[in-house]
Amino acid sequence: MKKLILILSLIAVVGCKSKKVQQKEPKPDDIVKLATSQINSSQKNKAYELGKRVLMTCNTSKFKAFTTSEATQSVINNITIDKLSKTCTKYRMWYGTFIDLQLAEVYQNTKNQTTVYRFKALYTKKVANKEMRVFMNAENLVSAIKTSDWVDAFKYN
C-alpha cells in the first residue's frame, strides 16, 4: 500500500510539472544594428527632441503634449503630466537633475520597420545609469518610449 501511494505521488508530481511558456521575441536576424551612415538624420533628431522633451519635464514641470504628427495615439494617451510627475519625482530624488541624452546605438526591426534609438540619459548624480529607448515606426511617429537601467548588451523588448 505504501509503495502504491509513493508511486501515485511520484506520478502526480511529474505530471504536474510546470511547462515553460515561450515568448515570441524577434529573431536576432530581424533586429539589425544600423551604422551611423545608415541613420536617417531627421528621424534621429526627432527621436532626440521628443525623448528630451519627456525627460526635461522633470526639470521644468511643464510638458507639451505630443501631437498626432509626432506620436501614435497610444503614446499620446499614455504619456500624461500625472504619470510623468510621479516618475520625475523618483528620478530627481535618485538621479538628480536631467542634463541631456547621448545617442548610443540605433537598431531596426526589419519585420515591422520600427527603428529603436537607444540614448544614454545623463543626470547630475554619478550613480545614474539610465537609458531611454525611443521607438519610431515607418510613418516617422513615436510608437513607444521606454526608460530602464543601462545594460551594455541590447535586448529588444
Language-model segments: residues:
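Hydrophobic alpha-helical targeting segments used for export or membrane insertion
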Residues: 6-11
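Positively charged n-region of N-terminal signal peptides that target proteins for export
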Residues: 1-4
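Acidic, low-complexity intrinsically disordered segments
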Residues: 41, 57, 93, 151-157
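C-terminal motif of bacterial Sec signal peptides marking the signal peptidase cleavage site
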Residues: 14-15
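Charged, alpha-helical scaffolding/interaction elements associated with membrane systems
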Residues: 60-61
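Short, low-complexity N-terminal intrinsically disordered segments enriched in polar/charged residues
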Residues: 18-57
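Short solvent-exposed beta->alpha transition segments
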Residues: 65-113
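Exposed beta-sheet edge and beta->alpha loop/turn motif
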Residues: 106-157
